[in-house]
């Protein structure tokens, strides 16, 4: 049995977002967040999804960007070409880009970031699947990076747009977990542990005029009842991954709020160690799978906002 076949009682959680009337503050926004990023704010060395939610594309950027429909477009890369074998990627980098500390962005930063991600002892969650597949990194000039892969990867450009492939400055990379410095439209301002993280607009961003918000604050609110109260009081402007689906009708009926329901990668699973008795017997695992009513869990615990997992799914 493969690891993904162990997902016996998995449900795909719906992303429940509610926005409040406090949105009248046009140049700042306060968003609720279920989980505080841990253990730090470096998405290239820690796996928590909450890290990328705060800093990816806001503070830190990569070579490419993934759109809502899954298409890939340039970000720090201006353009690229791929050889016929699908193993050699040549990226032309944008010029005039600077990190928040004033350091210029160039090909050396890309080389450093990817070598760091694939180094022995790296804790980058994409190390094995992405960075170990890069056999050679060439920087023929400051604005060109050539990545040579061991084997062709049709998802490589997509993977370059994930938080794990964010580009860091060698001079500040070591402090990314507590004070991330990137090339993005927002700068890291403050982290009040247990309370909030604040980002402020980067006035030197290459497209600063398009950045309408001067300040973004993430408030950590894990308790569903507290999420409801914060929205109703106008203390927060929005709550992605809203944790009280039973309260959705209340917000949907209130014209002050907009409710958006969508899918996420969140999963609720039963994890089993197949090497331990009695779970080393496939018949036991099949019995557990048959006994779990996935739909009942979705309906009872999530008010129907979820989908039972009926096949293989990555953990």
Q: What is the predicted function of each stretch?
A:
Residues 158-217, 223:
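Gly/Pro-rich hinge or "lid" segments in bacterial periplasmic/extracellular proteins
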Residues 78-123, 140, 146, 230, ...:
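Aromatic- and charge-enriched surface segment that lines or borders ligand/interaction sites
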Residues 32-84, 115, 181-183:
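N-terminal lobe/hinge region of extracytoplasmic solute-binding protein
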Residues 9-16:
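Bacterial N-terminal signal peptides
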Residues 26-35, 78, 88-90, 110-113, ...:
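Short, well-ordered beta-strand elements
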């Amino acid at each position: 049995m493969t690891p993904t076949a162990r997902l016996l009682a998995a449900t795909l959680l719906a992303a429940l977002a509610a926005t409040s009337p406090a949105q009248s503050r046009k140049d700042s926004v306060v968003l609720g967040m279920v989980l505080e990023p841990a253990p730090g704010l470096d998405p290239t060395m820690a796996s928590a999804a909450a890290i990328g939610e705060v800093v990816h594309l806001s503070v830190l950027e990569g070579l490419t960007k993934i759109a809502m429909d899954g298409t890939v477009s340039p970000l720090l890369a201006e353009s690229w070409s791929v050889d016929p074998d699908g193993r050699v990627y040549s990226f032309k980098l944008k010029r005039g880009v600077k990190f928040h500390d004033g350091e210029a962005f160039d090909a050396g930063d890309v080389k450093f970031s990817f070598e760091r991600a694939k180094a022995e002892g790296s804790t980058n969650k994409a190390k094995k699947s992405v960075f170990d597949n890069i056999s050679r990194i060439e920087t023929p000039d400051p604005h060109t990076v050539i990545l040579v892969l061991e084997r062709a990867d049709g998802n490589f450009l997509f993977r370059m747009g994930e938080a794990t492939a964010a580009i860091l400055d060698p001079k500040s990379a070591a402090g990314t977990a507590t004070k991330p410095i990137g090339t993005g439209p927002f700068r890291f301002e403050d982290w009040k542990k247990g309370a909030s993280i604040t980002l402020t607009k980067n006035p030197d961003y290459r497209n600063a005029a398009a950045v309408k918000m001067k300040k973004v604050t993430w408030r950590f609110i894990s308790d569903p009842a507290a999420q409801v109260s914060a929205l109703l009081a106008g203390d927060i402007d929005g709550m992605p991954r809203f944790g009280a689906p039973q309260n959705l009708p209340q917000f949907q009926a209130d014209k002050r709020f907009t409710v958006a329901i969508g899918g996420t990668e969140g999963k609720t699973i039963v994890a089993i160690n197949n090497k331990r008795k009695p779970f080393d017997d496939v018949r036991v695992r099949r019995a557990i799978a048959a006994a779990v009513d996935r739909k009942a869990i979705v309906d009872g615990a999530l008010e129907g906002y979820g989908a039972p997992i009926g096949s293989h799914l990555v953990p």
